[in-house]
């Protein structure tokens, strides 16, 4: 769980920014949103397949883009 120690003389904005950065790095908000509603195993697998396809297409696009520059 992210947490920060507020230093003496720290402004609220500075402390809040450091806390927000930690939560973003630890994916706390993303995980909470994902767990908000129950997701069955089939739905999880379906999302994983879709994201895998997107990743492959993205890599293929980048590869073709790189090859066209040569």
Swiss-Prot record:
This is Small ribosomal subunit protein bS21. GO terms for molecular function: structural constituent of ribosome. Keywords: Ribonucleoprotein, Ribosomal protein. InterPro entries: Ribosomal_bS21 (IPR001911), Ribosomal_bS21_CS (IPR018278), Ribosomal_bS21_sf (IPR038380). It comes from Helicobacter pylori (strain J99 / ATCC 700824). Belongs to the bacterial ribosomal protein bS21 family. GO terms for cellular component: ribonucleoprotein complex; ribosome. GO terms for biological process: translation.
